[in-house]
Amino acid sequence: MEKANSFTKEQLIACGQGELLGANSPKLPIDNMLMVDRIVRINEDGGAFGKGEIIAELDINPTLWFFDCHFKGDPVMPGCLGLDAMWQLVGFYLGWEGAQGKGRALGVGEVKFTGQVLPDAKKVTYKLNIKRKIHRKLVMGIADATMEVDGREIYSATDLKVGIFSDTSTF
């Protein structure tokens, strides 16, 4: 059976509930912490390193929850939410490949913010290039990523690391 190469918001929510990739697969956050509305492309052999890529989007509108509290009178999307979205997508990628367990962000090499997401923006686009995949006792994905707002690159991150764990009680 061929794997899907794109996903809707409803499917991503189902992933957060353990219904899309399996009950024991890594889950996406749900509700306000899900920072992705759709995955428009995911594959195992594309991207800058030929090891996989993910292109995903988030629709922006002035009613998004974070604009009311970050900051009063000066609304801007928190940079950490864009970074978290990148980790979310690396974890999703590992689950899409068949990894089982709980996903956890393990680190990032370098992060640069060169712009901001304001309430009048229309769309954020995440572009992830998978650099390395480890499928042994430890399952881990490493990726480089960028985030664009309305076609302009504003964030970049190198060496985003996500691990998949069967037991997180001692993590």
From Swiss-Prot:
Q: Name one GO cellular component term.
A: cytoplasm
Q: Which SUPFAM superfamilies match?
A: Thioesterase/thiol ester dehydrase-isomerase (SSF54637)
Stored CDD domains? FabA
Q: Where are the transmembrane segments?
A: none
Q: Which GO terms describe its biological process?
A: unsaturated fatty acid biosynthetic process
Question: Can you tell me which residues form the catalytic site?
Answer: 70
Is the keyword Ion transport in the record? Answer: no
Q: What do we know about how this protein assembles, alone or with others?
A: Homodimer.
The record's listing under HAMAP family reads: FabA
- For this entry, the protein name equals 3-hydroxydecanoyl-[acyl-carrier-protein] dehydratase
Query: From which source organism is this entry?
Result: Shewanella denitrificans (strain OS217 / ATCC BAA-1090 / DSM 15013)
Q: Top-down, what is the taxonomic lineage of the species of origin? A: Bacteria, Pseudomonadati, Pseudomonadota, Gammaproteobacteria, Alteromonadales
